[in-house]
């Protein structure tokens, strides 16, 4: 029996649902995921460049500190594994092979990727015996054997060259896309410095996605303190808190920062940049690519048809 399924044609200009955007440390380029592939676009806007064309789902691009490499996850071999490729594209190298989901969150240095996964380490090194609270692992870009970096759940890590590390915690199993969440398990931001852990936020809602400011004495982050997720900045000692964006309809997601202080984030399916002392600017993105969706998908079925 022939089955015809109508599909939607690909958008080319001003596309929506550009996800997991990340500005390069040198501030020149923004990487993002769109329709299951990784793209880059100049930080000033323009035509996007498609880096992956595999039929699998590719997402969560993460920049190396020197802006020369991108790590991302892909299910092209069955489960979500971590891959790395040159910023210009080309064949990616597979770094992980576990049968579970592995998602890159940061580069520890130019040669080491940090990623989260629920691989379940030994009882001596795990925080809670539940796969919903992932551990952090590290793997070399040469695809060496992964090593446990932290049994403590650390999400959206931002790390400085001296090893000082910011992250938001994960105390429970609440969906990260839930909005207006108030409970004892809302996320807070922490600093790990020289083996000591310091809690930096205490709002009874969501504070998450910290990124270091250039000098290392302050940081940017996302908070629902004003009712919806917006970008804030504060000093490490908790002083001089500033709200930098004032979006009201939808939450801000995917905050990253270049070393010159330029911020990049996603809002309402589009990408914005924010320079110090300026107002947020929506990034104009044109995606010029071959159409990958079919108008008709013809399938021949021999069993299983029902009215």
Where are these regions (language model features)?
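Short coil/turn segments that connect the beta-strands within blades of beta-propeller domains
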Residues: 26-28, 66-68, 110-112, 162-164, ...
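Conserved beta-strand position repeated across blades of beta-propeller domains
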Residues: 22, 62, 106, 158, ...
């Amino acid at each position: 029996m022939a089955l015809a399924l109508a599909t939607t044609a690909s958008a080319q200009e001003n596309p929506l649902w550009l996800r997991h955007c990340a500005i390069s440390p040198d501030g020149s380029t923004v990487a993002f995921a769109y329709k299951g592939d990784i793209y880059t676009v100049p930080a000033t806007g323009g035509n996007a460049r498609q880096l992956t064309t595999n039929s699998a789902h590719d997402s969560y691009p993460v920049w190396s500190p020197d802006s020369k490499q991108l790590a991302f996850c892909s299910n092209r071999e069955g489960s979500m594994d971590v891959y790395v490729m040159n910023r210009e594209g080309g064949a990616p190298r597979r770094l992980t092979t576990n049968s579970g989901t592995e998602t890159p969150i940061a580069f520890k240095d130019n040669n080491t990727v940090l990623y989260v996964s629920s691989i379940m380490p030994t009882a001596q090194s795990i925080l809670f015996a539940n796969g919903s609270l992932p551990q952090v692992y590290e793997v070399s870009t040469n695809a060496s054997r992964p090593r446990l970096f932290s049994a403590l759940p650390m999400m959206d890590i931002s790390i400085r060259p001296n090893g000082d590390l910011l992250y938001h915690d994960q105390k429970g199993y609440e969906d990260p896309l839930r909005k207006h969440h108030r409970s004892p398990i809302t996320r807070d931001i922490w600093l790990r410095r020289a083996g000591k852990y310091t809690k930096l936020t205490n709002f009874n809602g969501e504070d998450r996605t910290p990124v270091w400011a250039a000098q290392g004495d302050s940081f940017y982050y996302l908070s629902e303190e004003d009712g919806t997720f917006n970008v804030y900045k504060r000093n490490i000692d908790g002083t001089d808190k500033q709200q930098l964006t004032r979006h009201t309809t939808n939450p801000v997601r995917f905050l990253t920062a270049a070393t010159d202080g330029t911020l990049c984030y996603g809002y309402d399916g589009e990408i914005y940049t924010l320079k110090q002392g300026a107002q947020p600017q929506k990034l104009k993105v044109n995606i010029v690519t071959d159409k990958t969706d079919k108008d008709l998908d013809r399938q021949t079925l021999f069993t299983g048809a029902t009215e």
